[in-house]
Curated annotation (Swiss-Prot):
Effect of disrupting the coding gene: No visible phenotype. Altered mitochondrial protein stability.
Superkingdom per UniProt: Eukaryota
SMART domains the UniProt entry points to: AMP_N
Pfam families per the UniProt record, alphabetical: AMP_N, Peptidase_M24
Protein name, UniProt field: Intermediate cleaving peptidase 55, mitochondrial
The protein's role, per its UniProt record: Aminopeptidase which cleaves preprotein intermediates that carry destabilizing N-ter amino acid residues after the mitochondrial processing peptidase (MPP) cleavage site and is thus critical for stabilization of the mitochondrial proteome.
SUPFAM superfamilies per UniProt: Creatinase/aminopeptidase, Creatinase/prolidase N-terminal domain
Residues that hold Mn(2+) 1 according to the record: D307, H383, E410, E433
Length: 493
């Protein structure tokens, strides 16, 4: 989609004309997010977001309309902007349902979908002051021309138009997580709610998002591959720099230079007993010689996330106690992955992993009773994965897996320092997590390139040439023997 040069400038006043285009080339309109014209290195013609074409977005909307009862509306708001302080926002992340259905990566809009009207988008109206502070954003023109909305209005028209749509609908589905007062405060919405006509949309959208299309799988594979490369580089680096904060910074750097827009979540980098805190996030401690470090990380690539965990000894050698416990988690990881196939459920995988882990922990004398198992592992063996890290959370774990589902397999054990067990096991936390695509015949491990065998990890850590200057400048990693930079802006390594 090419925008004309006439759109390049925006009148600030009668006498003053200021161009605020972040990507001004005199021929390309800035709509506040990449387009094939503004970012040809990222996007091919016909794509609305990198890797996903307009036909796919239209197909998703058609499927959602088919799932809606007759004469129903679906209202999906973009995610709210969260402020760090005063006028300074946190990095914006779009609501996954809104992104899935519209392709719009920006805040301030509300999308409404119905059989009668198709996609109707209410878009933000920027003032010159907004543009001066935040740059150009997608408005009504972009809604029609880029996102291919059937109808597009400025957001100020929402109360009048949406009220009328709600009044004429028998049911209103909406995205509760990102619900906006722009519509929940409308009298007609509140009347519908009081009559029991307002329903949750996520049960429908999460259903659609469970099965990934070929284009989505390409992005999921790429996201997983970036996570594997980033974690491997960080693992190698850990021998010279056993520090949670440095490793957290490095894994983010390694993912972002490979094209990821952000991490899928704040990485968990727990050294020693910090690894027994499941979602440890402080990442502020040195890792003691001989301790393990657990790193749970993932990145987001054009809306699709990865989720990967490895646990290793930065010193390069597992102790015999660490090896014994690690082997139990590794065997459980591998056995559960082997069970992944159409028809199996996450619940069944969880039951299987609980049996394996309980048996092992009892045999090692760590558990005195199977009843205590949940004190050492309160987590599920896995979850669905996609646009969100705990994706399609409205779908339960009793759903038979189908080709195109992506799930995680993440057995772990988290032994608090105070747990009543032989002292040598106290304060150890181990998790090994992979991303698994369900195929017609079984599975494909998307994170299979990241080593997890003890001998492979030890070999890698002990045959790696370190560059000490990397402590102050991660870029100098490219000077490490055997690594080469290339100048492709999407892929630096
Ligand atoms: N890796 C984060 C989680 O699964 O909760
Ligand atoms: Mn996970």
């Amino acid at each position: 989609m090419q925008f004309l040069a006439r759109n390049l400038v925006r009148r600030v006043s009668r006498t003053q004309v200021v161009s605020r285009n972040a990507y001004s080339t005199q021929t390309v309109r800035d709509i506040g997010q990449p387009t094939p014209a503004s970012h040809p290195h990222l996007m091919a013609e016909g794509e609305v977001t990198p890797g996903i074409r307009i036909e796919e977005y239209i197909g998703r909307r058609k499927k959602l309309v088919e799932l809606l009862p007759e004469n129903s509306l679906a209202i999906i708001s973009s995610a709210p902007v969260k402020m760090m302080t005063d006028v300074v926002p946190y990095t914006f992340r779009q609501d996954a349902d809104y992104l899935y259905l519209t392709g719009c990566q920006q805040p301030g809009g509300v999308a409404v979908l119905s059989d009668e009207r198709g996609l109707c988008m209410f878009m933000p109206e920027s003032t010159p002051k907004d543009i001066a502070w935040e740059g150009e954003v997608a408005g009504v023109d972009a809604a029609s021309e880029v996102f291919k909305a059937d109808q597009a209005y400025p957001i100020s028209k929402l109360p009048e138009i949406l009220s009328d749509m709600i009044r004429h609908s028998s049911k209103v589905f909406h995205n509760v997580q990102s619900a906006s007062q722009r519509y929940t405060n409308l009298d007609d919405f509140q009347n519908s709610a009081s009559l029991g006509k307002v329903k949750t949309l996520s049960s429908l959208t999460h259903e659609l998002r469970l099965i990934k299309s070929p284009a989505e799988l390409k992005l999921m594979r790429e996201s997983a591959s970036i996570a594997c490369q980033g974690l491997l580089k960080t693992m190698l680096h850990s021998k010279g720099f056993p520090d949670e904060g440095i490793l957290s910074a490095q894994v983010e750097y390694e993912c972002r230079v490979r094209g990821a827009q952000r991490m899928a979540f704040n990485p968990v980098v727990g050294g020693g007993s910090n690894a027994s805190v499941i979602h440890y996030s402080r990442n502020d401690q040195r890792i003691k010689d001989g301790d393990l470090v657990l790193m749970d990380m993932g990145c987001e690539l054009h809306g699709y996330v990865s989720d990967l965990t490895r646990t290793w000894p930065p010193c390069g050698k597992f102790s015999s106690v660490q090896e014994e416990l690690y082997d139990l988690i590794l065997q459980t990881n591998k056995e559960c992955i082997k069970q992944c196939k159409p028809g199996t459920t996450i619940r069944q995988l969880n039951t299987y992993s609980t049996e394996l882990l309980c048996d092992g922990l009892m045999k090692m004398g760590i558990l005195k009773s199977r009843r205590l198992y949940h004190q050492l592992n309160p987590t599920s063996i896995g979850h669905y994965l996609g646009m969100d890290v705990h994706d399609s959370s409205a779908v339960g774990y009793d759903r038979p897996l189908q080709p195109g589902f992506v799930i995680t397999i993440e057995p772990g054990v988290y032994i608090p320092s105070s747990f009543d067990c032989p002292e040598r096991f106290q304060g150890i936390g181990i998790r090994i997590e992979d991303d698994v695509l369900i195929t017609e015949t079984g599975y494909e491990v998307l994170t299979g390139s990241m080593p997890k065998e003890i001998k492979h990890i030890e070999t890698l850590l002990n045959n790696h040439c370190h560059d000490n200057s990397a402590r102050t400048s991660p870029v100098s990693l490219c000077k490490v023997k055997g690594l080469h930079t290339n100048r492709n802006p999407r892929r630096l390594f």
